Regions:
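Charged, low-complexity, helix/coiled-coil-prone segments
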Residues: 1-8, 46, 50
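Enriched for short, Lys/Arg-rich terminal
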Residues: 2-5, 16, 20-26, 58-61, ...
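N-terminal first-folded block
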Residues: 7-40
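Residues that form or immediately flank small-molecule/cofactor binding pockets and catalytic motifs
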Residues: 10, 51, 81
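Nucleotide phosphate-binding site architecture
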Residues: 12, 47, 86
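A short, surface-exposed loop/turn module that caps and links secondary-structure elements
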Residues: 31-57
Length: 87
């Protein structure tokens, strides 16, 4: 059973903008999110100040998320260029 998806208003705006500017990247992102909802463990576990979060790479961009096991949900936290997302 797939996990529920949780996003923020900020990510929703990013996704809407991406769907208009780069349809191919948006399609790839959408497929990757579906994969994550089916198997949240596919992302790379992060360390340091981002411990507990996971990332998947989509071209030069990274999608950061966390798994909320108690709620059977995946919360998307950030999506940005690789150089900017790791702060």
């Amino acid at each position: 059973m797939p996990y529920e998806l949780i996003t923020s208003e900020n990510l929703d705006r990013i996704f809407v903008k991406l769907s208009k500017k780069d349809k191919l990247q948006f399609e790839i992102l959408t497929r990757k999110i579906k994969e994550i909802l089916e198997n949240p463990q596919i992302g790379e576990p992060l360390k340091g100040n981002m411990a507990g979060q996971r990332s998947v790479h989509i071209r030069n961009f990274c999608l950061i998320y966390e798994i909320l096991e108690n709620e059977k949900a995946v919360k998307l936290l950030d999506y940005d260029h690789h150089d900017k997302v790791y702060y």
